[in-house]
Amino acid sequence: MADAAPFSPQLIATAQNARGLELLMLFGSRARRDSHPESDWDFAYIATDAFDPAAFIGSIAGTVGSDRIDLVDLNRAGGLIRYRVARDGWAVFEAQPGFADRFQLEAVRFWCDAESVLQRGYDEVLAELTP
């Protein structure tokens, strides 16, 4: 992530005001800057149990002016989605300085270690499903 992504003060404030939110990342086409006007908004988060994802989607929808929002819990997400968020994502909010960097390092490190093993597993399953 060479250049900082510009986020509206309203988007940052929405994230700051979300109880229990520790990290919010924008990823997908809007983070890669290859979106079109109808593209959805892909957000990923890490939060404590105090965080209310449903309420947050409502808040963020009002902030970005769209109800086309995907919200991914990074504590429950698989290795590939965590890697893609780490690779392409932009930190909108982090409760503590360096939180996003630590997440990105851990996600990339895991994927680099596990990708070949996971790919072999996927290939084996697909081979069994193919008639």
What are these model-predicted stretches?
Residues 1-23, 31-37, 47-131:
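Catalytic core of pol beta-like nucleotidyltransferases
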